Amino acid sequence: GIDVRVAFCFPDVYEIGMSNLGMMLLYNMFNKRPDVWCERVYSPWLDLDKLMKEQNIPLFALESQDPIRDFDFLCITLGYEMCYTNVLQTLDLSQIPLKAADRDESCPIVIGGGACAYNPEPLAAFFDLFYIGEGETVYDALFDAYKANKATGGSREEFLLKAAQIPGIYVPAFYDVTYKEDGTIASFAPNRPGVPEKVQKQLIVDMDKGYCPIEKPVVPFIKATQDRVTLEIQRGCIRGCRFCQAGMIYRPLRERDVEELKESARAMLKNSGHEEISLSSLSSSDYTHLEELVNFLIDE
């Protein structure tokens, strides 16, 4: 049976959110677990936002139409800083208290992840926890800890304490942060025992073992910004440009096996009805087997 219900939010409109590869990878991975049911949620546009507030309609998940506040987890992917106000809109429309400190046992655990989670402090008050790094590494342990805590009747705080011990998980409530006059961080220290002093980012070491390929992509019911199959061919980048955040945080470079990519491409095109495929990475021209892969895709 289903033990853990997850609402996965991309805090922007559907057309943009449906084109996000990171969200689709984790949505696919979560739903492969028989004990987890993951659904999607996006930020409504201004007209719908206004209507939902007027009619007192809480924000709901796409698949079941159940209110977000009834879920165990609300996972919000933070791709860029410009969506931070949409994060607050999502919490507000879901009728979940904006600040983590004001939430009780009936509220979902609100998780932040993605590229912006590497600088969590601007949003720390609004999240119960952040995962730092690539989501594939952390979530299985997190869901298992949640299930174990639920089975013993543990409290929200007991779960967060267990979660804080999982590598890559940052629970802002368990740390004291002080600032210098210019707004930069002066000190960062845990405020209770058993919580690590530093949170280290977690990465998939082997892309052939840790990666969960998408075989059946969800097809949008309206035109999305990227109306094609997206195939991730590698992670990280060898260039090391100083201005590039992604190049720094997704180090080191890890390539996917070319034979696996061929299988993935075949399955995704067959199961989606799309006729175009984009090869996704920070620097696709650096992929070792690019010529072989492109020739295969043209011939197929």
Where are these regions (language model features)?
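Short hydrophobic segments within beta-strands
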Residues: C9-P11, V41, T77, G113, ...
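N-terminal [4Fe-4S]-dependent radical SAM core
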Residues: G1-A7, Y14-E15, P172, T178-T230
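Flexible loop/turn segments at secondary-structure boundaries
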Residues: Y14-G17, L46-D49, M82-T85, A117-P120, ...
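Low-complexity, highly charged intrinsically disordered N-terminal segments
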Residues: V6, F10-P11, G17-N28, K32-M52, ...
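Glycine-rich beta-alpha loop elements in corrinoid/cobalamin-binding modules
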Residues: S43-P190
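Radical SAM [4Fe-4S] cluster-binding motif and immediate context
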Residues: V205-E300
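Conserved, mostly hydrophobic/aromatic
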Residues: F30, L74, D128, C237, ...
